[in-house]
């Protein structure tokens, strides 16, 4: 079984994600971590960092050496890297840092007064993460100004040590484990977290008013594979100094793993929906047949749809509640997520997809009742391919979980043809972090799905499904005709009715599974006057 473990998202101070596969830790670096930020104008009492009297082993700068930089610099480095056999870089930490507990690691905090570009009139600030605990890998960072890059060396002055931390901070350049970008996203004069890069190739971002939820990665390799998943890592970053009057920050990243090296550029524009344009070039060392482009990772524990064996005071618990797709034929598809009893992998074949993404559609606090986690504020993530991505599939992986601390949902685009070894593969896409992209939603779209036992008076294998559709705009006198299809079992009692509470319609039907353990369901509404209507998809399992 594959699972993605993280610290409870209900903790207000942090969220921790570690990647586990087949019951064993395959990439301790596969972690994303973010701690609570403070307003820019707040100047904390700074505890001077303890400094190791005996220097730690000095690590050599491999990628971010100070010197000339242009748009092809990282591509050239990735190409040279891929031409050689993969080398697992070993950059040892002083023993004390390598063995930090979670509480000790969390007590090493970046000093906000040392933020990069602070007091320079720049609309962004940057703070780095310390190495230690699960975050053993050394990540190099450079700051780019004009045509020059300057290596950002580790210095203990960037960090403060609280009372819990008993280990001294080193005085040598041990690098970092990642960084986060701050912006006046929500309030003028207050620099809130906007985006985090930390752990393998994980990153995540926020739209206005959001709280951290799902994550993305640079690349997915061998997801849910019996041999174990491979986790590429961003080994180095080059962050361009933003212009003082700009709403854009650009980050370049070098990706590496046993199978592939690559160069990425992230152009980030914060807003109600934060937009990130991604340009990537891959240089495979081996043929990539089990590759996922634009992968997203999320959590779904329970909702009104699916299993009802969770003893929880909260009606719903999830970072995302559905996979939205706009395929190459212009069809809008909505697939509610599930927490299955067994690992499930679904592939939605397509040609030149227009978009897909894990969406948090339910935005009502009453649906979650969680005063700490506030799942209603978790961002949706919409992926819009740039150019023709050709034939392939949107892949959805749903992993059983008994707790919200596990990220158990993965989605990505899988090209139909493998990417050959020794080739140079380019792709690009736009990410939208925030509310659901309204322009990509059908004029008649699914607002809610629920299911339960068809006969509440006695036990029965028959299932009742209820799908609510909402109309954008005023209701009309037209009544649609419902078409429900199932890959097995028998569908009965299909009923469509007006639903004034949702300014739309309610579709209800029953499913008799018979002897089936897995059934694919598809529901469509047909109007006398053609309309853009979402197609509802669902995989029922025992």
From Swiss-Prot:
Entry keyword annotation includes Signal: yes
One GO CC term on file: outer membrane-bounded periplasmic space
SUPFAM superfamilies the UniProt entry points to: E set domains, Galactose mutarotase-like
Compartment list: Periplasm
Signal peptide range: 1-34
Superkingdom: Bacteria
Entries under Pfam families matching the protein: MdoG
Pathway linked to the protein: Glycan metabolism; osmoregulated periplasmic glucan (OPG) biosynthesis
GO MF entries: carbohydrate binding; catalytic activity
Family: Belongs to the OpgD/OpgG family.
Protein name stated in the entry: Glucans biosynthesis protein G
